[in-house]
Every structure is written in C-alpha cells, then in structure tokens.
Amino acid sequence: GTAGIEATYEDVLRGEKGEQIVEEDVLGRVRRVVEERAAPVPGDNVHLSLDLELQTVAEEALLASMGEADSPRGVAIAMNPQTGEILAMVSLPTYDNNIFVEGVTQSDWERWQDPHRPLINHAVSDAVPPGSVFKVVVASAALQEGVLTPQTQLNCSGRIEVPNRYYPNDPGQAQPFYCWNEAGHGAQDVVGGLAHSCDVFFYKAGGGFEETSFKGLGVERIAEYARLFGLGEPTGVELPAESGGLVPTADWK
C-alpha cells in the first residue's frame, strides 16, 4: 500500500514471496516446476472498525454540507466515544488509490495540483482550529480552577467589546467579538453556555470581562488544560502523516 491503513500495515499485509525454478517453452509458458525453493507466505488480514454504511452516509452528508456552504474541502469523522474506534472518516477532495497500481496519467497529475490538496488526508494531516468543541475544554478548566461554579451566570448580549491594550481608554479602538446568535442568549450558567454553544459566554470564561471585574482563565491556564486534554500532540491513530497540532501560548504569539 502507498497510503492510509495499507501503508501503515504494509509489512503485515504483504506477506512473503515464494521462489520456484520452472521450465518454460519458447512462448514463456510454464511447462513444469523443476524445484520449489520457498513457498509463498500470504499476508495477514487487518480488520477495520469502519462501518461501511455509516462511511457512505458520512460522505454523502459531507458533500451536501460542502455544497450548502460553498466549501471546496471538508472532513467528517464519526467515533465510538467509549472506545475511540473510528467508525467513519471522510476527507474531501480525495483520490482513487488504485491509480497508483494502474499507472498515473498526465490528467491524473494535473488534477492533483488542486490547491485544496486531494492527496492529503485532511482528517489527520491538517492542523486547524478546533472550533466550538474547544468550549468543553474551557468549561472543564474554568470549573476545575474555580473561575466558574455550576451556578455562575454570565450574560450574553450578542457581542463583547474587548478594549485595545494600547488605547484602553478609547472606546473607538475596542474590538467587538460576536456570538453566533447576534440577539444574545441572556444570562446563563455553564450548562446553558454549552447547550447553546454561546460564544460570548466562553469569551468571558476564557478571557474575563473588565466591565464586571470578572477574571477569566487566561491564556496560560487555557493552554495548560488544552494539553491535559491531549491537544497539541498526535493521537496515535494508525494512519501516516498525522499532525500533532499546536497549543498557542503568549510566548508563542
């Protein structure tokens, strides 16, 4: 195999070649085996956790979502949260592995020059921001550190104004950050913040909010807990070229 699971388990799947001395006729046809020097050893089988039906559904759903968002590439992964088994994994755009067996044509090569890199498994090789799933990290860290209690209420008006550190007294220099729900979610506790995926709640939980003197986690504690959750390190998935990602810190920035 040249990629994916087949590349990872090439030594297991390949087996061992046999060796014979044979007699051939003038047309190259084998007439008889003169000597059997070594019998071939078949390779072992590898059983995957992938669910074929779920894999098909995931690919169809991802294609539909990419079309709706007018996005040129996307990833979908379905896992068993109890075991970590990967039940479906889709990376688009993609390519056909069999091309490497049959021979790469000029048109194949030109198609692979797509800037969205179809030869890359974006599910494991890209390093991208985690998005709203990171709210679970912030929520857990804030509760563990006592920044939040289960009863703490933070208000979401749909946006938060962050003062410019170089012009703290000039409101015109402040930077607004918006919640996905621009109407706001109002006052809510951490369960509500997670249930609504409220951006402003976690802006405040992570960075604090000067108007109410609320002290958030801060960059270093967020980074510490991100690493405790395993971010910034390879997962060890049995696929080649996995990216470990990056947990940014104040020093890194």
Label the model's feature ranges.
Residues 1-43:
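Small/polar-residue-rich segments within soluble enzyme cores
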Residues 24-37, 50, 81-133, 137-253:
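Beta-lactam-recognizing serine transpeptidase/beta-lactamase-like catalytic domain environment
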Residues 30-74:
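Conserved, well-ordered alpha-helix/loop/beta-strand core segments that scaffold catalytic motifs
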Residues 74-77, 87:
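Generic short beta-strand
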